[in-house]
Amino acid sequence: MERRKTLEYVTNQKQVERQILELVKTYNVLYKKQIYAFFAVDGKEKFVGKALHALLKERLIYMNEITKTVSQHEEAYQFREKGTLKAFWVLLSLMEQKKIERHFLAEKEEYPVRIVFVGDAEIYDILYISEAEIQLVNQLFSRQNPDGCGHIVIVEKPEEIPQIEIPNVIGFCTVQEEEGGIDYYRREERKRRNTKAKRTIGCRAENSRTCRSYACGSP
């Protein structure tokens, strides 16, 4: 019995190592907190510490103790992308609420999309739009044919939401990049031009990423 438990532990440990390596290769740079949160969804966070240590020892990853980030190599941090880090927090939030079958980093050509994921055989994406990019993004989407993909849009401030004019948005949110706190919002039906964003989740807790609600219903 004891041997079986040991073998099971080692198997889980190796599996977590492989998954961490895959995550880092996919998203380039992640906060260590994000990696722990990713495995906490399946109750495997207890394997993360030793897995990171093993990967560091083999020089398969690099960990910056100042920024608390994990990447493939030391130079990678300077190429970190704020929108992707925020989008990964949103992905983690959704993973706590529903089954995410697949997820991957969007191509540069898919700007402003950062992460694409599949849930219940439906495709969704997570966008990051800074205040300076709103007009450009509106123009880009005005030239595209709607693809039916549901969009979750990250903004810097909720006051920016009424300015965003893209189809198939199922929810808006603001995200704290390093801590992962998330506030979700939805936009009321456009009966007037001065549509306001309606806050749907009161997430001011220390870890608001774990709130069990979604702005416009689960995607």
Identify the meaning behind each predicted range.
Residues 20-26, 33-34, 60-141:
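Nucleic-acid-binding surface
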